[in-house]
C-alpha cells in the first residue's frame, strides 16, 4: 500500500504539472491510495467507482457486489461499507467472488468468463435490490442479457456520467 501511495503521489505531481482539472483512478484496488494522496494537492482526486457506490446506496437496501478478483473485491467492499456508514443508512452488502471467471479471462477464454459472470449476476437478482459490478471488464456481460429486474451498476457508466456532470457545472 505504501508503494502504491508513493507511486500515486508521483502521478499526482505529473497531473499538476500538466494543469489537469481532476485526477481519477479507474482501478478499485488503488482507490484508497489515491484518497490518501488528497492532502498533498488542491487537485481533485477521485475514484471511478465513487458515483457507482453512491448511486447503489441510494437505489437499494440490499446491495450485491460482484468481482472476479479478491484484490478488487476487498477494497471495493471496504469503500462501500465506509460510504454506507457516512450516509447514515442501513444497507446489507453481499459480496460475490467469481475467481474462476478471472482464471478464464487470463487463459483467454472469454466465453467461460462471460458465462460465469452472467450466472453470478443472475443469481443475485432475487437477493439484491441493486447489483454493483466491481470491475469494468464485467460490464460486457450486460450486453448479452435481457433487461435485468434490478439496477446493475458499473463504474465506467456511473463514473463517466459523474464526470460529465462535473464538466458541465
Label each PLM-derived region with a short phrase.
Residues 1-169:
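Non-catalytic structural scaffold of enzyme domains
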Amino acid at each position: 500500500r505504501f508503494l502504491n501511495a508513493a507511486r500515486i503521489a508521483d502521478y499526482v505531481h505529473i497531473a499538476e504539472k500538466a494543469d489537469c482539472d481532476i485526477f481519477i483512478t479507474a482501478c478499485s484496488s488503488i482507490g484508497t491510495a489515491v484518497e490518501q494522496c488528497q492532502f498533498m494537492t488542491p487537485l481533485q482526486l477521485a475514484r471511478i467507482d465513487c458515483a457507482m457506490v453512491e448511486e447503489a446506496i441510494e437505489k437499494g437496501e440490499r446491495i450485491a457486489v460482484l468481482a472476479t478478483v479478491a484484490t478488487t473485491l476487498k477494497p471495493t467492499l471496504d469503500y462501500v461499507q465506509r460510504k454506507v456508514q457516512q450516509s447514515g443508512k442501513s444497507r446489507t452488502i453481499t459480496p460475490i467472488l467469481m475467481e474462476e471467471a478471472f482464471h478464464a479471462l487470463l487463459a483467454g477464454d472469454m466465453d467461460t468468463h462471460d458465462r460465469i459472470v452472467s450466472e453470478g449476476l443472475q443469481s443475485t437478482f432475487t437477493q439484491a435490490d441493486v447489483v454493483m459490478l466491481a470491475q469494468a471488464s464485467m460490464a460486457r456481460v450486460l450486453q448479452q442479457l435481457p433487461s435485468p429486474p434490478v439496477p446493475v451498476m458499473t463504474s465506467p457508466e456511473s463514473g463517466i456520467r459523474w464526470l460529465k456532470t462535473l464538466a458541465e457545472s
